[in-house]
Amino acid sequence: MPQRQLQAELTKLLDSGNYADAMPFFDELIISGQDDPDINYENIVIGSPMVFPSGYMQSYAKTMDSSYITKAAEFCGSFVGKYPDHPQAIKLLQMQDTFLRMDQKWNEAVQVIEKLLDPAQAFRKKIEEEGKRSEMLNLYLGRAQCYHTLQNWVKGAVAFRELLTRADQARDEDKAAYAISCLTEMFVVTKRVDEVFPLLPRLSEETPARYDMRLNVNLMQGGDQLKEKGRFVEASLLYALTMTAEEVKNYYTERIARITAEKDRLSVFLKNPNLPKRRLAILRDKDNGLTMKLTTAKSHLAIAEKTASFTTNLRWSKASNFQDTKRFWESFWGFYWLYKEDPENELAEDFIYAAFASANTVKFTEKSIELGEQYLANKNWLKYGSDVTNIMANAYRLEAENQAAIAEGLQTALSTLDKEKAARAKQNSEEQYQRFFELCDRFLEKDPGNKYAVNFVNMMGSVYFKQRKFDQLLEKFAGYVAGVPDANKGYINNQSFAEGPAMPSALYLSGISLLSTGKFEEAKPLLAPIVGVYVEGLPLADGTLSNMSQDEEVVDE
């Protein structure tokens, strides 16, 4: 292309602010300058240094090719190295820092920032003389970001505190929030959790800094540290502030969409050929700023997507911490929804058991039965089978007694509605008792040597005594059928049961039942192994057999 045409096209592109398309023309000027002594390419560069990084960034914005960021950073550093006194040197160093951070070259970026903030160099003095406080604040922010990313807590401690001081002076809440998030993470990682608490009120504000992935992971770890020390209330504060990986992903996905939409709207204005140069320059700076925000948001999203989900661990920690602080209802619902929303999790058995046990703690019988039945229905779950069956049986027993009491209270009712209610309560009571005995019998048949066998025998004995169904107790425990003992029936005649811990209880309850029905001689062989003495004609205190409520209380205990 002829030199005159080349310069004309280049001037036209530069005037329109289209620096990206102007870059090939500069390359051609370099080639032309090798043969034409009238073309001084170096003077062209010195006269318009901002064109080159701006052109590279426009190319990056169009293609998202990160090599353009690298080229932009290299140009800025090279130019300032040659011309440190150039009027645009500070601006170019600031741009170099921005590009290096976009390219995630944190060590190189922080060196540039430290150079700009060094009181011994002219750069800082010039910035302060010109009163560019916002530029200084951005430098402090950049330095903090670099040390935070590098996890350099020694230098970071100074950088974070200085950023917080400067941000507070400028009343910049976003930058102050970021400084606080950095300090919080530093204190947790270095196990100085107590120093986090003065910062907590400021961490509750909705800013991008709150959605930093590492900050939230460390908040959870800080809560774990406090929980291990028994400081449950303080741990709950950190757990409450922790964002999950999914929340971080959603936030940055929405943020990327918002920034992209804003860039698209801005690009429409940038295409207007009639914009004044000053206005065009302002819009291009804003577009570059949005490009950096977009790159940062995408970087955060990438980190969140690579981070293994810790939602389950967080929810478990919250629920168990509620339990430790005796907030039992919150603990129950925490465990309950943890299981319900992820029933296929490899830890589902632990989830459902925790929810089941919590339901029993708060005496939520309906949920206790619901969860217990679901646990027992899964034949692969064996870890807590004994505990669940024991608690379930007791829950059915209590509910059956409750329904029986309702039915008894309405026996003399006259209204049809009350009579129907009494009938339903009676039927419910019978169904609950039926399920209670099924669980007890199944457990004792399967594992008569288990420590819980005593509980099942005592619970059944309690029910039989309250209902005065001694014949049924004797048939089940001692093998009495129609008043005649059968050596092939009854728990006490089962060798496996006889060797287990529940044998004394079964003998005692069977013996007392025989006494209650007037069969004193038949009761003696059953009671003798328990008291250790066999005395013929053993006198019984008056009222021992008649006061059944007293016997029932003993059995319950």
Language-model features, listed with the residues they occupy:
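Acidic, polar-rich low-complexity tracts and alpha-helical solenoid repeat scaffolds
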Residues: M1-E557
